[in-house]
Amino acid sequence: MSVSVHENRKSRTSTGSMNISLYHKLSHSECVLNHLNTMRKQRLFTDMTLWAGNRSFPCHRAVLAACSPYFEAMFSNGLRESLDNTVNFHNSLHPEVLELLLDFAYSSKIIINEENAESLLEAGDMLQFHDVRDAACEFLEKNLYPSNCLGMMILSDAHQCQRLYELSLRMCLSNFATLHNTEDFSSLSKDMLLDLISSDELEIEDEQVVFNAVLHWVKEDLDKRKDYFPELLRNVRLALLPSELLKEAVVCEDLIIADERSKLIMDEAVQCKKKILQNDGVVTSLCAKPRKAGHTLLILGGQTFMCDKIYQLDHKAKEIIPKADLPSPRKEFSACAIGCKVYITGGRGSENGVSKDVWVYDTIHEEWSKSAPMLIARFGHGSAELDNCLYVVGGHTAVAGVFPASPSVSLKQVEKYDPLPNKWTMMAPLRDGVSNAAVVSAKLKLFVFGGTSIHRDRVSKVQFYDPHENRWSIKAECPQPWRYTAAAVLGSQIFIMGGDTEFTAASAYRFDCETNLWTRIGDMTAKRMSCHALASGNKVYVVGGYFGTQRCKTLDCYDPTSDSWNSITSVPYSLIPTAFVSTWKHLPA
């Protein structure tokens, strides 16, 4: 057969200009694919047969190679299959699943349902039909329930479907109390179990459930799993167990008796427990850190912008209960919880101007005390806990020698408080001084969103602090310049909401602190400037704020799984929240 090659010649009009026309048939690729599919069904020009079970599927190796890196490598790397005209998957693939994948290769269409989604995910991953695998993942994400979330966690881990794994993990964290006795729970890998029990987001109010779940999992395959026990035990919040249970476990539980590392972990928990109950100094051990579901929510507020009282919020019973009076009423302070203690830093009082004072409220013993004062008097600042230390960031201070006292420009200074020596230390300054910014910690780093600049403008930067390097850097840009916003953290996701403009006041965003990517989420139910937010039990709660002359009177809750906001309860109109913190609910004796 001869093949002629035609040279493309350029034609010119009488005026000498070029005359070129491009013809593009949009449906050409679809027509070719349809005709290839017809030839496959008629077994025309097929040069490869795939077998699954006892069924054969004639096809074209060029089509397979074009759709799948798996087949491309098989046919081009000198493997036996590149010479043979048969590939037999035996029983590793169900014939109907292979048929669906081939139909997709020749038509770009596939029907996914509850019966085949898991099989398509597995086969798509195995044969590197990545589009099919991703489509099956997306289908399973939309059909995730408490009854299947453990199985989906195992499946997504095996096939590296990161988003499905994260969604499954989140649902497992929310339903741990009903899942830990199931067959799927016993099938978890050690790393998956660690992902669950190490998370602050684990929704469990009785830590004994976690302790028993770990014992049960290890004993399901004792010979293979007993070496994992100390690592797992260290991630149980043992100091939150009743004292009698701790003592009994030390002398009666064979897994603990037989392992010196486990004995040391239990001894540490017993000492931490004793220290907490006796109010004997600061406890920073992981074994004494409560999970967020074991926290209670506290609103600090007053009948004016001058805060004078702490209120306990029971969002399940929908009650707001007065708890304690502040020793020194103040406004524009910041509050942050470390363990069972709430630290109230700085602010402005009614008489003594800008304050360096730090008041500490012990929620277990319901007592107030004073810690060492800050190095700089400040207000309009932010604070966050990081590695059991307290950081205060930015704000204003009073201008020296000016009467009446007027605020300084926004501060760059950052201070760190270590409760153990009761000492403040000046740390690396912010890249840009800010006040009225949202300050949170996530993944052992500090994040500062927006704020008011030294020039009194809104700031659009995300400032990021690495404590190991003691250095600030610019992490990302905010979707828009922000100040008077609120922030809350769920894992690696930081939720930002509110602001002081018409466009930002009701808006809410999610920032992934690992990828630095922003996602717009559902708007709040009301516009809020100077609101306050925190995360508890895999949900985000927002309280307070105002816009114009309208004061917000509801406690609202955001559910990330449904991307929806709901009002939980009303806040008394006479209560103006100044801060919102989450701390220990109770400690069993």
Curated annotation (Swiss-Prot):
Q: Where is the BTB domain?
A: 46-114
Its GO biological process terms? positive regulation of CD4-positive, CD25-positive, alpha-beta regulatory T cell differentiation; positive regulation of fatty acid oxidation; proteasome-mediated ubiquitin-dependent protein catabolic process; protein ubiquitination; regulation of translational initiation; ubiquitin-dependent protein catabolic process
Q: List the disulfide bonds.
A: none
Q: In which pathway does it act?
A: Protein modification; protein ubiquitination
Keywords linked to the UniProt accession: Kelch repeat, Repeat, Translation regulation, Ubl conjugation pathway
Q: Where are the Kelch repeats?
A: 296-340, 341-388, 389-444, 446-492, 494-538, 539-585
Q: Name one Pfam family in it.
A: Kelch_KLHDC2_KLHL20_DRC7
| GO molecular function terms listed in the Swiss-Prot or TrEMBL record | ubiquitin-like ligase-substrate adaptor activity
According to the entry, every stretch annotated as the BACK domain falls at 149-250
Assembly mode: Component of the BCR(KLHL25) E3 ubiquitin ligase complex, at least composed of cul3, klhl25 and rbx1.
Provide the function of this protein. Answer: Substrate-specific adapter of a BCR (BTB-CUL3-RBX1) E3 ubiquitin ligase complex involved in various processes, such as translation homeostasis and lipid synthesis. The BCR(KLHL25) ubiquitin ligase complex acts by mediating ubiquitination of hypophosphorylated eif4ebp1 (4E-BP1): ubiquitination and subsequent degradation of hypophosphorylated EIF4EBP1 (4E-BP1) probably serves as a homeostatic mechanism to maintain translation and prevent eIF4E inhibition when eIF4E levels are low.
Q: What is this protein called?
A: Kelch-like protein 25
Q: Report the source organism.
A: Xenopus laevis (African clawed frog)
The primary gene name is klhl25
